Amino acid sequence: GEAPAGAEADTVKGDALDLPFDDGSFDRVIAAEIFEHLPNDTAAMAELCRVLRPGGIAAVTVPSWLPERLCWALSEEYHTVEGGHVRIYTRAELEAKLKATGFHIGPHHHAHALHAPYWWLKCAVGTDNDTHPAVAAYHRMLVWDILKAPRLTRTAERVLNPLIGKSVVVYLRKPLDRAGDGV
């Protein structure tokens, strides 16, 4: 949703391995599509847990295994670019790492199924080839879908998300105490 009227926010530049916030600074945190880029993902996960207050909720997203694996198979360039993806997670691997850093694992779902074919096209024709007719047409469709949210594409995405959702979303809770029994 949108921020309520009068809400304020600050932009802070930081390092995912050493966040510039005190322990327990946030009630809610989101880590969207970052862990797959970091060689030391577990340190970043621990930092996320550190800045979340006990009882706080986190949402983490990473690329889903199947769509990401297809991108890697279609394009060496997709995953060897500097700063690019250094790993592909299964949901079980991601959840095990998050649990090991102190989180309780909650529900999960897949999202952005209509985005997976777009990335497969880009991987097939070149990740920088935004002018390819198929890539450009698919991009226009995605923008239209985002802006208009027509029933047809919303239904298609809801049906396809469990199969080819580009991202997996995992919800987490930080225990009230480090023993983990206070949630």
Where are the predicted features?
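A C-terminal cap/extension of S-adenosyl-L-methionine-dependent methyltransferases
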Residues: 73, 112-183
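Conserved S-adenosyl-L-methionine
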Residues: 103-113
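A structural motif corresponding to the C-terminal end of an alpha-helix
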Residues: 97-103
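Acceptor-substrate binding/catalytic loop of class I
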Residues: 76-93, 110-112
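Residue-level signal for beta-strand positions within conserved beta-sheet cores that form or flank
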Residues: 7, 82, 104
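A generic secondary-structure signal marking the coil-to-beta-strand transition
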Residues: 58, 85, 166-168
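Conserved SAM-binding loop
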Residues: 1-71, 90-95, 170-174
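A short, structure-level motif marking secondary-structure boundaries and short turns
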Residues: 3, 78-81, 154
